[in-house]
């Protein structure tokens, strides 16, 4: 467990040494742990199992739903690192819906995409983990301006201007 310390989780359980275990009471405490994770945005985290060892110690196994990878998809021009650098949700950390939502907003706010969506794929190392696929639909970021004019003093004159908001896919102008 990385989100909550063992001490915090022990307080959630509120079971004293020597106390007789009641399965309904333990079930309610487990629901409380799951609810706390969900409330704080860790929607993949859950109690995966409980056991009592030979010494009568209660062990609670928690799966936190770790992000194994963040994979950009649909980007033809924009480089992967331009998209992934905007992610506040990090690989190797528990999945948090609030961080993912903020990450999607940051990618969209780059101004290079018409649409940004997230797909969650099962982890390859552990099915309780997740791979985040960030699917983008790029829009045109280049502009060209042509202009012409004529004056008696200068004669015919013209202007050609090229602009690119996502130069070489790096996010540079």
Residues covered by each model-derived region:
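Short loop/turn motifs that connect adjacent beta-strands in outer-membrane beta-barrel proteins
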Residues: 167-173
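Periplasmic polypeptide-binding modules associated with outer-membrane biogenesis and secretion
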Residues: 1-164
């Amino acid at each position: 467990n990385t989100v909550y310390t063992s001490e915090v989780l022990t307080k959630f359980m509120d079971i004293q040494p020597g106390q007789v275990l009641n399965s309904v009471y333990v079930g309610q405490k487990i629901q409380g742990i799951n609810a706390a994770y969900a409330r704080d945005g860790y929607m993949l985290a859950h109690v995966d199992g409980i056991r009592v060892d030979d010494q009568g110690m209660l062990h609670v196994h928690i799966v936190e739903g770790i992000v194994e990878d963040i994979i950009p998809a649909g980007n033809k021009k924009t480089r992967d690192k331009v998209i992934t650098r905007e992610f506040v949700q990090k690989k190797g950390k528990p999945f948090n819906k609030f961080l993912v939502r903020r990450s999607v907003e940051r990618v969209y706010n780059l101004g290079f995409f018409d649409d940004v969506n997230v797909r969650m794929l099962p982890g390859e190392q552990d099915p309780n983990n997740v791979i985040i696929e960030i699917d983008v639909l790029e829009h045109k970021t280049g502009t060209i301006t042509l202009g012409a004019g004529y004056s008696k003093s200068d004669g015919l004159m013209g202007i050609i201007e090229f602009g690119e908001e996502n130069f070489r896919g790096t996010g540079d102008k």
